[in-house]
């Protein structure tokens, strides 16, 4: 169950369905393959098999868990580099420590988001705190990679610490859905995330049988990924369930519904909605680097091998730039 919730959604601002917007059709629904990341924690590759023209400016997204760790089981990632894009780590339940070679770092937990702009490059590490390793416990989150346009790929690294209590909370007209706006704008309400590439990121919880039709910028793409539960998407009511991604076509609104009966282990439909303005530039992606050309990729690897992306360990405990 997501950590950020409210007892009575009807106390929140309500998002009404747009009166005359063209409904976005569902182009495809894909199923995320499972794998392992870092030191061996389980992930689902949410965007596997989706053509990049439907994802742009998003690059990849991994759902981490949901998993109940036994003592000694929690795992993270070792120190590794990034350049040319942003990582967005959203912890739905659980806790994670992180540190980077630019002096940023801290702990994110229960609805918090770490928004890291790698820009010209840095090193970072993500790991469960020692207390979680010793005791075990619930862990569930996701990590999204967002591309940067060529003009911003070599900008100075930046870090934002977005606390769960600061996300914009909204609801549907009947209170059947809780909408957490992490970044971007929805019906005049702004999320706290500062984005270099215009995007929207929303975590929606729909009660059984609930439906939402949201206004959606026509210059954005549209994606819906199911974290847990069962439902349908689009006017055509295309079925969708845990670990699946729906790709929407053009239009001014998108619709998600929760089935009346949910899986026994999850009471609601949990879905992440993403939209972004396509960058429409060449992309060269290999491992932890996302650039525009192969030469730029080679330069990134050379800079990393020569220590130009930072040193380990970084000074920890500094106030991160852009904390929210």
What are these regions (language model features)?
Residues 1-324:
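Jelly-roll (double-stranded beta-helix
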């Amino acid at each position: 169950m997501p950590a950020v919730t409210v007892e009575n959604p009807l106390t929140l601002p309500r998002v009404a369905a747009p009166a005359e917007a063209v409904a976005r059709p569902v182009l495809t629904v894909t199923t995320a393959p499972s794998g392992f990341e870092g030191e061996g924690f389980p992930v689902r590759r949410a965007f596997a098999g989706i053509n990049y023209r439907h994802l742009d400016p998003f690059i990849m997204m991994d759902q981490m868990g949901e998993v109940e760790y036994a003592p000694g089981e929690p795992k993270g990632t070792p120190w590794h580099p990034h350049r040319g894009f942003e990582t967005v780590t959203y912890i739905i339940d659980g806790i994670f420590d992180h540190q980077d070679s630019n002096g940023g770092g801290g702990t994110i937990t229960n609805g918090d988001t770490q928004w890291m702009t790698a820009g010209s490059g840095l090193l970072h590490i993500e790991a469960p705190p020692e207390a979680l390793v010793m005791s075990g416990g619930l862990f569930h989150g996701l990590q999204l990679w967002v591309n940067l346009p060529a003009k911003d790929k070599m900008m100075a690294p930046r870090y934002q610490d977005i606390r769960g209590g600061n996300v914009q909370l909204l609801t549907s007209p009947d209170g059947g859905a809780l909408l957490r706006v992490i970044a971007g704008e929805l019906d005049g309400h702004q999320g706290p995330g500062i984005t270099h590439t215009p995007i929207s990121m929303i975590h929606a919880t729909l009660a059984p049988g609930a439906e939402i039709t949201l206004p959606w910028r026509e210059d954005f793409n549209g994606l819906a990924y199911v974290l847990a539960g069962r439902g349908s998407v689009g006017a055509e009511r295309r079925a969708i369930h845990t670990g699946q991604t729906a790709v929407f076509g053009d239009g001014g609104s998108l619709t998600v519904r929760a089935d009346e009966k949910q899986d026994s282990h999850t009471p609601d439909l949990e879905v992440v909605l993403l939209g972004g303005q396509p960058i429409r530039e060449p992309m060269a992606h290999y491992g932890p680097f996302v650039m525009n050309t192969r030469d730029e990729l080679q330069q990134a690897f050379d800079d990393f091998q020569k220590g130009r992306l930072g040193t380990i360990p970084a000074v920890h405990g500094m106030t991160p730039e852009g904390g929210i």
